[in-house]
Amino acid sequence: MRKIFTLLFCAASLATGLAQQESYFTNPVIHGDVADPSIIRIDQTYYITGTSSEWAPYYPVFTSTDLVNWQQTGHVFDEKPEWTKSSFWAPEWYQHKGKVYVYYTARKQSDNISCIGVAVADSPTGKFKDHGPVVEFGKEAIDAFILEDKGKLYISWKAYGLDNQPIELLA
């Protein structure tokens, strides 16, 4: 009887020790295609979105509390915004004054030129309201990045056809 008790005690101790070990992960932690990812942390939750190209719904949203275990919780847009045609690329999260913004690239229906639009919601999993294009520049404007410095907001982006020109600060 004592041998059985000792064996059960050792098995329980081993199981407890294994359960307390750190969990390891292997890449990718999100399976599938999440190109041009953007990640934001709000409170204790991380949110990631990425390029969806031509596939609807547009810009998938995944959530995680540990950066290892991710769940898809929705999309920025279920339907494409009216002004857009295609090429739904490079969404960029930004949080400001209690709102969540997504700056994104899409081609306009009117002239097939890519530009940067913005959508706003109360949370990354909320219903986003599209506000249309905010950057239309030259042949195309893509890949927005938002920066706040000393209370001022700046946006940077890539523009085609400017290969041999210096970086400019536009006001």
Give residue spans per PLM region.
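Carbohydrate-active catalytic/glycan-binding domains of CAZyme proteins
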Residues: L18-A171
